[in-house]
Amino acid sequence: MSVAIGCDIGQQVDPTAIVVGETYRPEQTPEELKHRQRPDRRHRVRWIERVPLGTDYGRVVERIAVVAGQAQMIGSATIVLDATGVGRPIVDMLKRSTSCSLRAVVFTSGQHETQPSYDVFRTPKVDLVTSLETVLQARRIEFVPDCPLQEDMRAELSSFDFSMSDRGHATFDGASGTHDDLVSALMLAVWFGERPGLDDLWGAELAEYGAAAL
């Protein structure tokens, strides 16, 4: 099980949004065991929060650090931050404020992801949109009963239109006058939770990985 804290840093229009998502694989069904199939990952949203518009970045960072500290009590936690507009200073402030792992994501309009450093991803927005759309369509996401702002999240999701242009560019547009901060934070958490990891190595693959690590 892993925990991703998706953070969409607010600027002039939208407030900062924080979404804590837990990613796990359910137990295998007898049929999956028989055919050595891996159950798909599922996502459980535990916390949704908006930091009021106009809050200075120092206080935004403090709040993210508090939420990250609480999330670390659930399991291995990683802050996944949209660094497209805020730049490196916010990332550096967060690194000084929390012991939680951090990944900075810079959205691009390209087709291939690059990773200029261990904690920075330059990622096509289509990858994040597709990850969320796939999880939603497969109904592999749920909200814990006491998760705050889940109705606001559902409203944002219902007003968004996920589409792909003829040139392969992904877009997601909300209804006029609506915010997209919660959906953006959710996209970051789900995208990170869907990325390949050690739980994708099974049987001989896992044994081979373990031998290589010795």
Short names for language-model regions:
Residues 1-107, 113-122, 126, 130, ...:
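RNase H-like, metal-dependent nuclease domains and their acidic two-metal-ion catalytic environment used
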